[in-house]
């Protein structure tokens, strides 16, 4: 739906009480589909939080490129700040915030690399200029100037003028397998609705708790 207000009842609830959901991924799929229809740009944008070697939190926006019952997938450079932090401490938190719908979803869990086959398949779908950029960028490293970056891009582009661009060996993806997923929906006077799903093991069923706002 394109108008979040059209989804509200006088009670402030969205059409259908989402707190009755018994499984988080089906609920996420519903909310994400509505975000795709409602958000003006990047409904798949999510904040990714990691920690460095000193335990100092780090957060940045990334794009979710896939999700299913096993978790949420994103891609980047393995040697980037986030890549190094995840290699040292493979745990992360995600936050989806859909302002047009007045909703957010929080995710916490363990992180593991995707397979080479998954990374290759996704990389092949990227525009060629983005593929070239992945080769030219030394993400998170100091850059002398924009011109130096443009020179690197031109050099890679000349090398791959014809044919397909292979995936760089230092570029891949990660999957966040959730142990916690929380759904939050705004209601008047800050009397919001929150439910949290938890499980310690992907083989176990989810437990659900309603939380005070």
UniProtKB/Swiss-Prot annotation:
It holds the Pfam family PNP_phzG_C. Keywords: Flavoprotein, FMN, Oxidoreductase, Pyridoxine biosynthesis. The keyword Signal does not apply. InterPro entries: Pyridox_Oxase, Pyridox_Oxase_CS, Pyridox_Oxase_N, Pyridoxamine_oxidase_dimer_C, Split_barrel_FMN-bd. Its EC number is 1.4.3.5. The keyword Thylakoid does not apply. FMN binds at residues 60-65, 75-76, 82, 104, 139-140, 184, 194. Binds 1 FMN per subunit. Coiled coil: none annotated. Substrate binds at residues 65, 122, 126, 190-192. Pathway: Cofactor metabolism; pyridoxal 5'-phosphate salvage; pyridoxal 5'-phosphate from pyridoxamine 5'-phosphate: step 1/1; Cofactor metabolism; pyridoxal 5'-phosphate salvage; pyridoxal 5'-phosphate from pyridoxine 5'-phosphate: step 1/1. GO terms for molecular function: FMN binding; pyridoxamine phosphate oxidase activity. Its cofactor is FMN. One of its GO terms (biological process) is pyridoxine biosynthetic process. It catalyses: pyridoxamine 5'-phosphate + O2 + H2O = pyridoxal 5'-phosphate + H2O2 + NH4(+); pyridoxine 5'-phosphate + O2 = pyridoxal 5'-phosphate + H2O2. PROSITE patterns: PYRIDOX_OXIDASE. Homodimer. Catalyzes the oxidation of either pyridoxine 5'-phosphate (PNP) or pyridoxamine 5'-phosphate (PMP) into pyridoxal 5'-phosphate (PLP). Belongs to the pyridoxamine 5'-phosphate oxidase family. This is Pyridoxine/pyridoxamine 5'-phosphate oxidase.
């Amino acid at each position: 739906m394109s108008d979040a207000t059209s989804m509200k009842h006088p009670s402030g609830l969205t059409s259908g009480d989402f707190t009755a959901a018994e499984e988080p991924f089906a609920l996420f799929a519903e909310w994400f589909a509505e975000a795709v229809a409602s958000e003006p740009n990047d409904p798949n944008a999510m904040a990714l939080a990691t920690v460095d070697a000193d335990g100092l939190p780090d957060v940045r926006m990334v794009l979710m490129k896939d999700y299913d019952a096993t978790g949420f997938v994103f891609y980047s450079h393995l040697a980037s700040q986030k890549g190094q932090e995840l290699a040292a401490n493979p745990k992360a938190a995600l936050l989806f915030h859909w302002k047009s719908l007045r909703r957010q979803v929080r995710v916490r869990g363990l992180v593991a690399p995707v397979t080479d086959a998954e990374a290759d398949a996704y990389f092949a779908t990227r525009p060629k200029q983005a593929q070239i950029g992945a080769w030219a960028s030394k993400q998170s490293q100091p850059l002398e100037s924009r011109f130096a970056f443009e020179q690197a891009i031109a050099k890679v582009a000349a090398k791959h003028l014809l044919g397909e661009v292979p995936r760089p060996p230092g570029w891949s993806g990660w999957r966040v397998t959730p142990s916690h997923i929380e759904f939050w929906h705004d209601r008047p006077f800050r009397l919001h609705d929150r439910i949290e799903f938890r499980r310690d093991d992907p083989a176990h069923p989810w437990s659900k708790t309603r939380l005070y706002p």
